[in-house]
C-alpha cells in the first residue's frame, strides 16, 4: 500500500514523501495515528497545494517584515519624559513604552514589545539605537530621541 507521510517517520521517510508499506503497518499504525494518509492522486495534489500555499504565505510575511525593517531604519522616535536635576529620567523607558509611542507616532508600524531588544535600561536623555528582531533572521535598528519635558 502506498501512503503519503504527513510527518517524519523514523526508518521510513520524511513528511511529504510517498512510501510503499505493508497494509497492516499502514492502516493500523500510520493512518490510525495520523502520521500518513492513503496516497491517492487527490490526496497528493491536495497536500502539494497546501505546501505551496504555506510557502507563499511565509514569503509574504517575510516581505512584510523586511518592509517594516526598512521603514523603521528611516525614523527617529521622540519620547518626552520628566527629568530630574542631574539629567536622569524619573523611571526607565521600557519596551512597552517604546511600542506605545511607536504606535502613536507611526500607526502603520505594528511592533510587539517582544520584538524589541534593549541591552540596558534607558535612564537618561539622549539618542539611542534600539534593535528590533522580527524572527526569520530579520533584524533592524531604529533610533529614539529621549527629550526632557
From Swiss-Prot:
PROSITE patterns: RIBOSOMAL_L9. SUPFAM superfamilies: L9 N-domain-like, Ribosomal protein L9 C-domain. Belongs to the bacterial ribosomal protein bL9 family. HAMAP family: Ribosomal_bL9. The gene is rplI. This is Large ribosomal subunit protein bL9. InterPro entries: Ribosomal_bL9 (IPR000244), Ribosomal_bL9/RNase_H1_N (IPR009027), Ribosomal_bL9_bac/chp (IPR020594), Ribosomal_bL9_C (IPR020069), Ribosomal_bL9_C_sf (IPR036791), Ribosomal_bL9_N (IPR020070), Ribosomal_bL9_N_sf (IPR036935). Binds to the 23S rRNA. GO terms for molecular function: rRNA binding; structural constituent of ribosome. It comes from Helicobacter pylori (strain J99 / ATCC 700824).
Amino acid at each position: 500500500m502506498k501512503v503519503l507521510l504527513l510527518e517524519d517517520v523514523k526508518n521510513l521517510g520524511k513528511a511529504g514523501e510517498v512510501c510503499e508499506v505493508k497494509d497492516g503497518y499502514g492502516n493500523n499504525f500510520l493512518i490510525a495515528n495520523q502520521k500518513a494518509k492513503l496516497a491517492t492522486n487527490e490526496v497528493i495534489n491536495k497536500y502539494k497545494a497546501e505546501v505551496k500555499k504555506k510557502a507563499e504565505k511565509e514569503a509574504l510575511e517575510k516581505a512584510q517584515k523586511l518592509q517594516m525593517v526598512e521603514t523603521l531604519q528611516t525614523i527617529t522616535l521622540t519620547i518626552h519624559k520628566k527629568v530630574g536635576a542631574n539629567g536622569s529620567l524619573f523611571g526607565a523607558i521600557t519596551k512597552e513604552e517604546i511600542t506605545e509611542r511607536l504606535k502613536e507616532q507611526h500607526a502603520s508600524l505594528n511592533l510587539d514589545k517582544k520584538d524589541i531588544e534593549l541591552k540596558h535600561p534607558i535612564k537618561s536623555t539622549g539618542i539611542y539605537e534600539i534593535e528590533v528582531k522580527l524572527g526569520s533572521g530579520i533584524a533592524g535598528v531604529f533610533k529614539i530621541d529621549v527629550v526632557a519635558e
